[in-house]
A protein has these predicted regions:
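Hydrophobic transmembrane alpha-helix bundles
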Residues: 68-78, 135-140, 167-172
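Short beta-strand
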Residues: 28-33, 133-136, 143-144
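Extended, charged alpha/beta regions that create polyanion-binding interfaces
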Residues: 120-124, 134-136, 149, 156-159
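Beta-strand residues in well-ordered beta-sheet regions across diverse protein folds
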Residues: 39-41, 145, 154-156
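Generic beta-strand structural signal
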Residues: 97-99, 131, 138-143, 149-153
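Non-catalytic nucleic-acid substrate-recognition regions in nucleic-acid-modifying enzymes
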Residues: 2-129
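Glycine-rich adenosyl-nucleotide cofactor-binding module
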Residues: 149-172
Length: 172
């Protein structure tokens, strides 16, 4: 089973969702941020899902984040320690690579930490395992989305995620 956090331009999530529904008719979807962010759960494996999405060149879907781990949010300092532990657990993914960290939060999430604090905790864990935190030209991206219950954590390349900007933000 594959889980993805999917992002569209504000107001275009229904169209992005339809693009994915055509590719994965048996998938289930959960709204995270109305009109913009939703979660896809598909029966297919990660490589198959990412391959189909990239091959279809979606118009309305601007960013996808694989969910490799989902941690319950406790609302305390333990959340940052748990995030760092996941980074260390995924050391084979990041070791020796330039790695960007993207942190996004749903409005009203119980995750109490500032984006900068979460990024600092992840960057410190990356350094511990021999990865190089990077802002530009990353080889890998660690993405974290704090929703109403969980930290959704995943890793991939910019190509797999459709963008090297957090949530596929539009560049100006």
């Amino acid at each position: 089973m594959t889980r993805l956090v999917c992002t569209a331009n504000h107001g275009f999530a229904p169209y992005a969702l339809e693009e994915l529904r055509r590719l994965f008719p048996r998938a289930s979807f959960r709204l995270i941020v109305p009109g913009e962010v939703f979660e896809l759960s598909a029966e297919e494996g990660r490589e198959e899902v990412l391959g189909k999405i990239n091959a279809s060149e979606p118009i309305f879907l601007r960013h996808i984040q694989p969910v490799d781990r989902a941690l319950p949010i406790t609302g305390g300092a333990d959340d940052l320690a748990a995030l760092a532990a996941v980074v260390r657990d995924l050391s084979d993914t990041f070791r020796g690579r330039r790695t960007a960290v993207h942190i996004r939060r749903k409005e009203g999430t119980p995750f109490p930490h500032a984006v900068a604090d979460a990024k600092a905790a992840a960057d410190a864990a990356l350094r511990e395992i021999g990865a190089e935190p990077a802002m530009q030209s990353p080889e890998r991206i660690l993405s974290v989305f704090a929703d109403e219950e969980e930290l959704l954590i995943g890793a991939g390349t910019a190509e797999e995620m459709l963008s090297d900007w957090p949530g596929g933000a539009v560049r100006f």
